[in-house]
């Protein structure tokens, strides 16, 4: 994401959304009541004379819409902001009528807030920093099967699954030929995805020796791709293997600033502390609020959905209190396994400096 202009006195920030991740950030930055300005298309009835029917035209116009509904449409690659029009660049567009602004990759949008809160500013900074980082690709590979995923800012996107029937014994000539075809398919797919998505690193993992064989193959046949590959172990294959790579901190080691890896690891730490019953964790609104009041929270985990729901104001108060006591606040995406686990805990959890009970 690019910040094009800032007007602090007016509470306005003008940005350009460049990636799907930027749309995810904007979905969490824009709140009900904010005014969103952008170029858009609007159907407008054009008056005709008494002999001809009224004609509807689609006109380009610059509008300001006061947000009432904000929806993230991942598969359409859009954030849709719906609300009454409060500003229009054309006099023939009536104010007060409802309109939906569709924010896509490449859209320039101005967001005006009565007050920019700390978590809004943090997410905006994150989005700008993330635009300078490459994403990470994960490939979990074993005999004749490879599962691929991209680790994005908003979560894990499962990509291609490649399956080849390699036949019988490991050192059979036909099997070796089929394995070479399989390796070529995986390598070509990796090249395509990494080029398209601007990925600098790929983690190739798996439970057996196939990953090492594949890496040797890459060094011989695809040397440039091999330079971007890191080899790791997993205990399983498939999607479970992909999430194992993330949980074990492999992504974090490969690309330390990756948001998803940090979120998943923190949720896992919460679950570990719960299992140990060591008193250094709180979860659910009541427990977390008590820990915040004691100044005991070292890290507060907040599910992103709570910042769009009825508890938003209460949760924001807790976030501000934790920051005031020099704690860390991490907003966890609901789009990955860690977010699902946090949701099961009520959407709020805290790692504590000391026991409060």
UniProtKB/Swiss-Prot annotation:
Record Pfam families: eRF1_1, eRF1_2, eRF1_3
One Gene Ontology cellular component annotation held by this UniProt entry: cytoplasm
The name this protein goes by in its record: Protein pelota homolog
Name of the gene: pelA
EC code(s) of this entry: 3.1.-.-
Compartments, as annotated in UniProt: Cytoplasm
Taxonomy, superkingdom: Archaea
Membership in a protein family: Belongs to the eukaryotic release factor 1 family. Pelota subfamily.
Coiled-coil boundaries: none
UniProt keyword annotation of Hydrolase present: yes
GO molecular function, a single term: metal ion binding
InterPro entries to which the protein is assigned, alphabetical: eFR1_2_sf, eRF1_1_Pelota, eRF1_2, eRF1_3, Pelota/DOM34_N, Pelota_arc, Ribosomal_eL30-like_sf, Transl-rel_pelota
NCBIfam families: pelota
């Amino acid at each position: 994401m690019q910040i094009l202009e800032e007007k602090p006195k007016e509470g306005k920030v003008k940005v350009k959304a460049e990636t799907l991740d930027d749309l995810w950030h904007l979905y969490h930055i824009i709140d009900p009541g904010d005014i969103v300005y952008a170029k858009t298309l609007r159907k407008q009835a054009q008056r005709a004379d008494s002999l001809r029917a009224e004609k509807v035209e689609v006109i380009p116009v610059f509008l300001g819409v006061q947000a009432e509904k904000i929806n993230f449409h991942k598969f359409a690659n859009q954030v849709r902001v719906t609300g009454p029009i409060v500003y229009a660049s054309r006099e023939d567009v009536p104010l007060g009528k409802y309109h939906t602004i569709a924010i896509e990759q490449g859209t320039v949008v101005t967001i005006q807030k009565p007050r920019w809160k700390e978590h809004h500013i943090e997410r905006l900074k994150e989005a700008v920093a993330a635009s300078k980082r490459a994403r990470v690709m994960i490939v979990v590979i074993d005999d004749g099967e490879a599962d691929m995923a991209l680790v994005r800012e908003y979560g894990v996107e499962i990509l291609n699954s490649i399956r080849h029937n390699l036949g019988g014994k490991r050192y059979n000539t036909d099997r070796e030929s089929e394995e070479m075809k399989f390796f070529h398919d995986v390598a070509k797919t990796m090249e395509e995805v990494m080029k398209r998505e601007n990925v600098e690193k790929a983690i190739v993992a798996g439970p057996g020796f196939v990953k090492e064989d594949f890496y040797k193959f890459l060094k011989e046949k695809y040397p440039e791709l091999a330079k971007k590959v890191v080899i790791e172990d997993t205990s399983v294959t498939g999607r479970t293997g992909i999430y194992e790579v993330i949980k074990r901190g492999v992504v974090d080691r490969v690309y330390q600033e990756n948001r998803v890896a940090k979120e998943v690891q923190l949720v896992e730490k919460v679950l570990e502390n719960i299992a140990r019953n060591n008193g250094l964790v709180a979860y659910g609104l009541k427990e977390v609020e008590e820990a915040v009041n004691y100044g005991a929270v070292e890290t507060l985990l907040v599910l992103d959905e709570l910042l769009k729901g009825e508890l938003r104001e209460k949760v924001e108060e807790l976030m501000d209190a934790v920051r005031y006591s020099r704690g860390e606040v991490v907003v966890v995406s609901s789009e990955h396994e860690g977010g699902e686990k946090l949701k099961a805990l009520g959407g709020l959890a805290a790692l504590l400096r000391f026991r409060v009970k």
